[in-house]
């Protein structure tokens, strides 16, 4: 993440190598900090053999930007099972993962689906602290349970549970951001201070799952316009945004205000 530091930083910026190197470590959920070194062309053949001998990874920089979409396209259905829920006894879970392994996402199919009509859909990013522990710092737990109840009452729909902890910066980095928030930063500033964008999520996996379920038209439970824009860009027709907001508490009130003021959330 800018600013880059080193005598050769202008070279890296012109070639676009620094952002791509940072993106690689973000994919690994590491702090986005890297050391760059230029390799003279004459040394490339020797280093190529060295990479193989020492099991070092070599990546074509041109493929890095396309990696999230490529992995989304490689998602396949791994398994499905009936899992009755408190708010919807007629529920099945369908797990998806890339054919070559990796992050697993889950489609929670609630009630009856009519894919000839617009399907009520919620895209929900994994939140260990909110979903499982009931954290008051966010509204994730309310949104998860509220979405399941709303879809059940509607008669059917899908909640796609995405492996995107902490707006896709990972649990460790999310907790680092919490520490910065306790020192006075808001959620946007904290992400920037540890080198991440305010929201690192890409919804191509969600779009691919919807398509594999035969869903092309959706009513989207969301307050986040970015979800609508990204789904629309993949060819999913979002015919309606369904408001999905819950009362704040003393611990998340400022967080929700920041989302409205700085990230365009619609409450």
Residue ranges and their predicted role:
Residues 41, 98-100, 113-115, 128, ...:
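Short, glycine-/Ser/Thr-/acidic-enriched flexible segments
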Residues 54-130, 257-267:
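Long, charged alpha-helical interface segments
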Residues 1, 16-20, 78, 103, ...:
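Conserved active-site and cofactor/substrate-binding residues in soluble primary-metabolism enzymes
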Residues 150-267:
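Conserved structured catalytic cores and adjacent interaction surfaces
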Residues 109-113, 117, 122, 138-159, ...:
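Phosphate-binding glycine-rich loops and their immediate beta-loop-alpha structural context
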Residues 1-8, 12:
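Single conserved hydrophobic/aromatic residue that forms the stacking wall/gate
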């Amino acid at each position: 993440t800018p600013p880059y530091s080193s005598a050769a930083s202008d070279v890296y910026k012109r070639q676009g190598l620094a952002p791509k190197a940072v993106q690689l470590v973000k994919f690994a959920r590491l702090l986005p900090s890297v050391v760059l070194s230029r390799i003279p062309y004459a040394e490339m053949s020797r280093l190529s053999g060295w990479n193989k001998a020492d099991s070092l990874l070599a990546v074509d920089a041109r493929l890095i930007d396309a990696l999230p979409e490529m992995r989304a396209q490689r998602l396949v259905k791994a398994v499905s099972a009936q899992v009755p829920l408190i708010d919807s006894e007629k529920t099945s879970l369908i797990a998806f993962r890339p054919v070559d392994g990796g992050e697993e996402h889950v489609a929670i199919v609630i009630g009856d689906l009519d894919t000839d009509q617009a399907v009520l859909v919620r895209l929900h990013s994994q939140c260990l602290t909110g979903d499982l522990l009931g954290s008051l710092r966010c509204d994730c737990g309310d949104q998860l349970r509220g979405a399941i109840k709303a879809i059940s009452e509607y008669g059917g729909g899908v909640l796609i549970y995405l492996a995107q902890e902490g707006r896709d910066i990972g649990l460790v980095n999310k907790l680092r951001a919490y520490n910065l928030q306790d020192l006075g930063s808001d959620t946007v500033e904290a992400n920037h201070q540890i080198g991440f964008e305010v929201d690192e999520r890409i919804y191509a996996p969600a779009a691919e799952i919807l398509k594999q379920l035969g869903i092309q038209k959706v009513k989207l439970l969301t307050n986040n316009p970015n979800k609508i824009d990204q789904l629309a860009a993949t060819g999913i027709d979002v015919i309606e945004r369904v408001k999905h907001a819950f009362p704040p508490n003393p611990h998340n009130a400022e967080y929700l205000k920041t989302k409205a003021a700085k990230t365009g959330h619609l409450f």
